[in-house]
């Protein structure tokens, strides 16, 4: 059955890295007999330029009917003071598709260990996933600003916590069978509920070990290798996922996914649109290419295709083929061609 993939190239280097990702997908699809159609739609700044809105109606309708969505990058300085900004499109599509779970793998590539700000012995064996709840918590509560005081309401329901916990435990079942739930249970009421629900969900997954960890002693920098799957609420997840992105020493090799309960998932690099290098052909496409691998595995259960891509990226880096952000001289096209060759 042919799968429908909606692509949102967006802004800056987005079109360049999207082309790289689709080039790799085309090659690997022929190897694993994966049939798909691509429906390219404007989004972000490109949506504003084309339709006056970062999430045009036709783009949203296509996304809702897709089997998966690939997003490259959005934003740029031309929109900094605009009344409508590209980032509003990302918030809107998350809401419209009910993307409640953000998944961010953190892995250290052997060929890039020297880029990490941590000592080699600290990053040895680092391979974990941060699972962040996206639709609840303090970001979506009431925000009240008065003249000399302010308050932000942090709300979570047991159902919101339960579904993100189940997602984390299911991911752990396919990995190291360990979940670390991060909260602030010694202070926050929401964290007390978070921990209670986590304990309840853990009973559904007897093959997975659950540990609780307070957010202020998570030790993600001092002992990152201890983690397998980390699950946490929106605010803590925002901070910890960004903190974890420091470990590899570059944003250029980190993919991510955002999942709904029943609809399509969205896959994207964690880096920005890099408008300063857009159009120069020097952008690093690896995050986008690894996002394609995540899509194959998580939306289509095409584990073989995902592993082919990941192994090809590993091999390419080990051959010393590096883009400028990684300390080399390879262009976007050269890096992409090398990865395709190594498939």
Task: Mark where each language-model region is.
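Short coil/turn connectors at secondary-structure junctions
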Residues: 1-4, 34, 64-68, 98-99, ...
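Glycine-rich phosphate/diphosphate-binding loop of Rossmann-like nucleotide-binding domains
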Residues: 6-23, 28-29, 147-218, 226
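Buried hydrophobic positions in well-ordered alpha/beta secondary-structure cores of metabolic enzymes
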Residues: 11-14, 67, 131, 168, ...
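Buried hydrophobic packing segments
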Residues: 21, 25, 198, 288-299, ...
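N-terminal beta-loop-helix "entrance" segment that forms/cooperates
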Residues: 33-57
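Glycine-rich phosphate/nucleotide-binding loop
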Residues: 45-48, 107, 114, 221-321
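N-terminal glycine-rich phosphate/adenylate-binding segment common to multiple enzyme folds
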Residues: 49-154, 235
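Glycine-rich phosphate/pyrophosphate-binding loop and the adjoining helix
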Residues: 135-181, 185-187, 205, 304, ...
């Amino acid at each position: 059955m042919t799968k429908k993939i909606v692509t949102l190239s967006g802004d800056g280097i987005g079109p360049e890295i999207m082309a790289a990702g689709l080039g790799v997908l085309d090659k690997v699809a022929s190897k694993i007999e994966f049939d798909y159609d691509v429906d390219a739609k404007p989004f972000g700044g490109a949506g504003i330029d084309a339709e006056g809105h970062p999430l045009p109606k036709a783009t949203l309708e296509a996304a809702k009917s897709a089997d998966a969505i690939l997003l490259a990058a959005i934003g740029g300085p031309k929109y900094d003071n605009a009344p409508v900004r590209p980032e509003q499109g990302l918030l809107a599509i998350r809401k419209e598709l009910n993307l409640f779970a953000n998944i961010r793998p953190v892995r250290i590539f052997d060929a890039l260990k020297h880029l990490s700000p941590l000592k080699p012995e600290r990053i040895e064996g680092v391979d974990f996933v941060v699972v962040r709840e996206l639709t609840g918590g303090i970001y979506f509560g009431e925000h009240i600003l008065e003249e000399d005081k302010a308050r932000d309401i942090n709300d979570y329901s047991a159902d919101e916590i339960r579904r993100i916990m189940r997602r984390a435990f299911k991911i752990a079942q396919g990995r190291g069978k360990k979940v670390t739930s991060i909260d602030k249970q010694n202070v926050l009421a929401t964290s007390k509920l978070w921990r209670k629900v986590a304990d309840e969900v853990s009973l559904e997954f007897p093959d997975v070990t659950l540990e609780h960890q307070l957010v202020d002693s998570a030790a993600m920098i001092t002992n990152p290798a201890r983690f397998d799957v980390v699950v946490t609420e929106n605010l803590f997840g925002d901070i910890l996922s960004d903190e974890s992105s420091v470990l590899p020493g570059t944003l250029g090799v980190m993919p991510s996914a955002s999942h709904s309960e029943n609809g399509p998932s969205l896959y994207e690099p964690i880096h920005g649109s890099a408008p300063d290098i857009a159009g120069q052909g020097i952008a690093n496409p690896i995050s986008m290419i690894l996002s394609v691998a995540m899509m194959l595995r998580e939306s289509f259960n095409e584990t073989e295709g995902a592993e082919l891509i990941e192994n090809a990226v590993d091999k390419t880096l080990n051959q010393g083929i590096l883009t400028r952000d990684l300390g080399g001289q390879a262009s976007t096209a050269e890096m992409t061609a090398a990865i395709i060759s190594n498939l």
